[in-house]
Curated annotation (Swiss-Prot):
<dbReference type="InterPro" id="IPR012340">
    <property type="entry name" value="NA-bd_OB-fold"/>
</dbReference>
<comment type="subunit">
    <text>Component of the RNA exosome complex.</text>
</comment>
<feature type="domain" description="RNB">
    <location>
        <begin position="458"/>
        <end position="807"/>
    </location>
</feature>
<dbReference type="InterPro" id="IPR041505">
    <property type="entry name" value="Dis3_CSD2"/>
</dbReference>
<comment type="similarity">
    <text>Belongs to the RNR ribonuclease family.</text>
</comment>
<dbReference type="InterPro" id="IPR033771">
    <property type="entry name" value="Rrp44_CSD1"/>
</dbReference>
<keyword id="KW-0963">Cytoplasm</keyword>
<dbReference type="InterPro" id="IPR050180">
    <property type="entry name" value="RNR_Ribonuclease"/>
</dbReference>
<dbReference type="InterPro" id="IPR022966">
    <property type="entry name" value="RNase_II/R_CS"/>
</dbReference>
<dbReference type="GO" id="GO:0000175">
    <property type="term" value="F:3'-5'-RNA exonuclease activity"/>
</dbReference>
<keyword id="KW-0540">Nuclease</keyword>
<keyword id="KW-0460">Magnesium</keyword>
<dbReference type="Pfam" id="PF17849">
    <property type="entry name" value="OB_Dis3"/>
</dbReference>
<dbReference type="GO" id="GO:0008859">
    <property type="term" value="F:exoribonuclease II activity"/>
</dbReference>
<feature type="domain" description="CSD2">
    <location>
        <begin position="359"/>
        <end position="425"/>
    </location>
</feature>
<keyword id="KW-0269">Exonuclease</keyword>
<keyword id="KW-0271">Exosome</keyword>
Length: 1039
């Protein structure tokens, strides 16, 4: 043990305080090397097949952590000394990032507690600087580590300090001290991305040092210190919340939604407007900020006018009501991430020096300001999407400083645009690693998978129950199956059987860690990125017909007439599904149509077996009755039926799209959805009963009443009244808001109700009161996700909780409340990212479809539209043919208004607009008036507004104030999914052909073994109903 004493003089003539510091040293500190024969081999170990170990010093770890995050860099030893320097000098954000890297088993790096090892640690000498001591201590630890491993493997210490290299490089044989650049060039010559990132970061650090020396005048006020911000929030002087920038007016409008964490009550009941970039004070979209309210005389209103772009200041809403307005005084937590950007044109590039260029790149996301980076590749990458990161934003700079990371691809290329969407949503879709795939079981003709004898304690349903599944056509990822039978007592027994994913994915394995990181399967318009390897998601965890499978089941015994539940059983089972039915086939059987017996191969034997046929028909019919009764109970409690559009993508070979299959509403859809909701509800009750402080549930809070305002106004225009005081009142009033002459009215009202909904989210029960558990949309007191463990990590956690609750699984690996709440936050973020990714990919395909078409001559660019919103200078439209929502201007940039002739044709001419609650009136100079009313049908022309920097966008132009009547050779207006299928199919085929012609077929990367283990491309109707609370229809409007 080392013991040091210091005498601290608190005041010049005050008393002295003696401080004693004890430092304990041990011989048995675990080294973490797989080559070591003496230390324990538990926990994370460095790989055995390494050629060397690399040890970064403090400065490398602080400045180049991003480079060390490359998974290709292996054998990294992080010394405790360097780790603590990051914590003390780089703050909590980077320290947490380092800790995540050390915990991640996918990265070959460990933490060595060198300051507790007796021979590795060196005490600081009198008068020695902290940096010199840290370097000396880390080098001594490298020497000890080399000798501890019996000199089997060399150790390389990397540093940027040339004096350190001169001092230590030749001191110990096989312990090398080199610069980071030399290390990357020598040991990893093929890892070009790491070297480029290193050079970019180095140049950024150099530029930052130059700026600090120059000391330019301040462009923004300094942020207040954290202790002042916290005190101000507690006293009520400042408010805290997350900054949300309006993407349509990114230079003008940002809003801070209060989190209600202040110490005193506030009468602010709405968002706080941050008007302009100066009051935003270097805060970026997503940052947690502290805001000071301005005086009421300085408050402004939210602009409700349509605008041409994010900097259009001419579009002003004179009727806007003022709202609380403030300015940012400090940043509580940054939300910086990777950003996709594009270089400006050559003539706009500012060159500084001979070897580097300081360039303002334009982010893909409108809400992010320009970022200044230093790079030598600006001209070479003119037409490419690149990834950049923000490093700092000093008060002396108009723009944040960042660095170049990597190239995604050429602008406009389909794969590059898809990669852009993934990066913008922080989605990583690397192939599953060898370590993860090595954990997978085998199921080949040579080595078929079989039920293990040790699984004999499972309830075997293979000979006692008629089990069947009902899924979309072609579905191969069957994660749920059903059974229903009559018991000798006269009661009914209903079973929901879910794939037992947790049997194949134990906690903290490589596969489990990867699934936790992804959190969900990501669905794009033309592809899917799985949460689990295909051998599980499409084979061994898929409840296919005629094969044995492990399941986790919920089985109810219920009254045969009232369907009241008498008792319930939970546990692990073995099942063999007898039939794999599609929704359409099940619907035909329920309706008494036996044609599937001739068309479906697996149903052919039933023609000769009337007994088994009768059993199946009875089961399908009875299942529908039970589901209907269950739904009626939820309806009486206020369950909502909202509106959405669902499409299932069918992929063919070479990553092309064959079709998008429309999902026609069937009674069987509701039947299966209701059975899954019932299972989720009962599992939620069970796990909360057993683990009230750390059960994973899903809540859906009521929407804020102001969000329903536009819905109420639209309904009022057609004579309907929408009551939003409760979910029951909302559901009843939506049911009554039917216009027999136009069914789209009710559809649009339900879509608007969907958009007004709050986000459903996962949570740990120990962090909320029981009153907050309620699921507003489903009208259930407790709810969770249990039925889709193949594609949702939350379901895997719930399976582990349930199995532990019924003593069929281990209890020692369950997460406590704090860890579970942190996991829930991660899953919620990933789910939102998945939804945004899906919407943005749909936007991409819509734009690519219309981009090469002449809007003046191509009839596919002409569509019927319905007005569902009124703005100061235009209207909001819904196109049922394509499922698109967008804006159309009634006043252009020249001040002309859109007037109509007697034949309905529209043209621009001088005039004025008057906005009323249910219409907008156009008055020309000739005193002629025309009205555009809510729910009016008009004819629009669709064209694409291209952008070099940002995503392309759909633009709508009203050409007639009457419905579009020419429907020849066009898809049915009542079937927008069919039109979307043609849209995505054509865009993908065009993109693939162009890519083959320009870049060669090697650029295409079809998923291996896709046909062997194909997973369904879309989500079931049940999944859609589950997620409608979070996801509204795509909005491409400028509103």
């Amino acid at each position: 043990m080392l013991k040091t004493e210091k005498i601290l003089h608190l005041k010049a003539r005050g008393r002295s305080v003696r401080a004693v510091r004890e430092h304990y040293l041990r011989e048995d500190v675990r080294c973490g090397s797989a080559l070591c024969l003496t230390c324990p081999r538990d926990g994370k170990l460095l790989s055995e097949d390494l050629t060397h170990y690399v040890v970064p010093d403090c400065q490398i770890l602080q400045d180049y952590l991003e480079v060390l995050e490359f998974p290709e860099l292996r054998g990294i030893i992080i010394m405790q000394t360097a780790c603590q320097s990051v914590q003390h000098q780089r703050g909590r954000r980077q320290y947490k990032r380092l800790c995540s890297l050390l915990r991640d088993t996918r990265h070959d790096c460990i933490l060595f507690s060198n300051e507790f090892q007796n021979h590795a640690y060196l005490p600081r000498e009198m008068g020695e600087s902290a940096l010199a001591w840290q370097t000396r201590c880390i080098y001594n630890s490298c020497v000890w580590y080399y000798q501890h491993c019996q000199k089997k493997i060399p150790v390389v210490m990397v540093t940027e300090d040339k004096s350190v290299i001169r001092q230590y490089n030749t001191e110990t044989q096989e312990v090398y001290v080199v610069s980071f650049q030399i290390y990357l060039e020598t040991f990893w010559p093929n890892l070009k991305g790491a070297l480029e990132l290193y050079k970019s970061l180095k140049e950024t650090h150099r530029e930052r040092e130059l700026e600090s020396r120059e000391g330019n005048g301040k462009e923004y006020p300094e942020h207040l210190p954290l202790e002042i911000l916290e005190a101000g929030i507690k006293s009520g002087r400042y408010q805290q919340g997350v900054l949300s920038v309006n993407k349509h007016r990114a230079q003008l409008e940002g809003f801070v939604r209060l989190q209600g964490l202040g110490g005193k009550e506030t009468d602010i009941q709405s968002d706080i407007l941050i008007y302009g970039t100066k009051p935003r004070n270097r805060a970026i979209h997503g940052d947690l900020v502290a805001v000071e309210l301005l005086s009421r005389s300085e408050w402004k209103g939210r602009n409700g006018a349509l605008c041409e772009n994010e900097t259009d200041e001419k579009a002003v809403d004179a009727q806007a009501e003022v709202m609380p307005t403030g300015r940012v005084v400090g940043i509580l937590q940054r939300n910086w991430r990777d950003y996709v950007a594009t270089f400006p044109a050559k003539e706009d590039i500012e060159t500084q020096g001979k070897n580097a260029q300081r360039v303002l790149v334009m982010p893909w996301d409108y809400r992010i300001p320009k970022i200044r980076i230093s790079t030598q590749q600006a001209e070479a990458l003119q037409d490419y999407r690149v990834v950049v990161r923000i490093d700092s934003w000093e008060s002396t700079s108009l723009y944040p400083n960042g660095h170049f990371v990597r190239v995604l691809g050429r602008t406009g290329n389909l794969e590059a645009e898809i990669a852009t969407i993934l990066v913008e949503n922080s989605i990583s879709v690397n192939p599953f690693s060898e370590a993860q795939l090595a954990e997978m079981p085998s199921n080949t003709p040579e080595s078929p998978w079989q039920v293990k004898p040790e699984e004999g304690d499972r309830l075997d349903l293979r000979k006692t129950h008629l089990v069947f599944s009902i899924d979309p056509k072609g579905c191969e990822d069957v994660d749920d199956a059903l059974s229903i039978r009559k018991l000798p007592s006269g009661h009914l027994e209903l079973g929901v059987h879910i794939a037992d994913v947790t049997h194949f994915v134990p906690p903290n394995t490589y596969t489990d860690i990867e699934a936790r990181s992804r959190a969900t399967t990501y669905y794009l318009a033309d592809r899917r990125y799985d949460m689990l390897p295909l051998i599980l998601s499409a084979d061994l965890c898929s409840l296919l017909g005629g094969v044995d499978r492990y399941a986790v089941s919920v089985i109810w015994e219920m009254d045969s007439s009232t369907y009241e539940i008498r008792r319930v059983w939970y546990g692990r089972t073995i099942i063999r599904s007898s039939y794999k039915l599609s929704y359409e086939v099940a619907q035909q059987l329920m309706d008494g149509d036996l044609e599937p017996l001739n068309t479906e191969m697996e149903l052919h034997p039933l023609k000769q077996d009337p007994v088994r046929l009768e059993q199946l028909l009875w089961a399908v019919g009875k299942l529908t009755e039970v589901a209907h009764a269950t739904r009626m109970r939820r309806d009486m409690s206020g369950a909502l039926e909202l509106e959405g559009v669902e499409v299932r993508v069918q992929l063919g070979e070479k990553h092309s799209i064959d079709d998008l299959v429309p999902k026609q509403p069937l009674q069987m859809h509701e039947t299966i959805a209701e059975c899954m909701i019932l299972a989720n509800h009962w599992v939620a009750k069970k796990i909360w009963e057993c683990y009230p402080q750390h059960a994973l549930l899903r809540l859906h809070p009521p929407a804020r009443q102001e969000f329903f305002q536009e819905l109420k106004e639209c309904a009022k225009a057609r004579g309907f009244s929408i009551d939003t005081r409760s979910n029951k009142a909302l559901a009843d009033s939506l049911d009554q808001a039917n216009d027999p002459s136009d069914p789209l009215v009710n559809q649009l009202l339900r879509m608007m109700a969907t958009q007004a909904m709050s986000n459903a989210r996962y949570f740990s029960t120990g962090s909320y009161t029981e009153d907050e558990f309620y699921h507003y949309g489903l009208a259930l007191e407790k709810y969770t996700h249990f039925t889709s463990p193949i594609r949702r990590y939350a379901d895997i956690v719930v399976h582990r909780l349930l199995l532990a609750a019924v003593n069929k699984g281990p209890k020692d690996n369950l997460l406590g409340n704090k860890d579970l709440e942190e996991l829930c936050r991660h899953i919620n973020v990933r789910n939102r990212a998945a939804q945004h990714c899906q919407k943005q990919s749909t936007e991409l395909f819509q734009c690519m479809f219309f981009k090469d078409k002449d809007p003046d001559s191509d009839q596919r660019c002409i569509s019927d539209a319905v007005i569902y919103g009124i703005r100061t200078n235009g209207v909001l439209l819904f196109l049922p043919r394509y499922g698109i929502k967008g804006a159309a201007y009634l006043k252009n940039i020249d001040g002309l208004v859109l007037a109509c002739k007697d034949n309905g044709r529209c043209h621009w001419m001088p005039g004025s607009l008057q906005r009323l609650p249910d219409r907008i009136v156009v008055t020309t100079q000739e005193a002629k008036s025309f009205s555009y009313c809510l729910f009016d049908h008009v004819t629009v022309r669709i064209h694409v507004q291209s952008s070099r920097f940002h995503p392309d966008s759909i633009r709508l132009e009203i050409i007639r104030n009457r419905p579009h009547s020419s429907q020849e050779a066009l898809p049915s207006a009542s079937n927008p999914q069919l039109a979307r299928s043609e849209l995505v199919k054509e865009v993908t085929r065009t993109a693939v052909e162009a890519q083959l012609a320009v870049e060669g077929a090697e650029e295409l990367k079809p998923v291996e073994h896709y046909q062997e283990y194909r997973q369904t491309q879309g989500q079931s109707l049940y999944s859609m109903l589950e997620e409608l609370w979070d996801l509204a229809l795509l909005d491409v409007s400028g509103a």
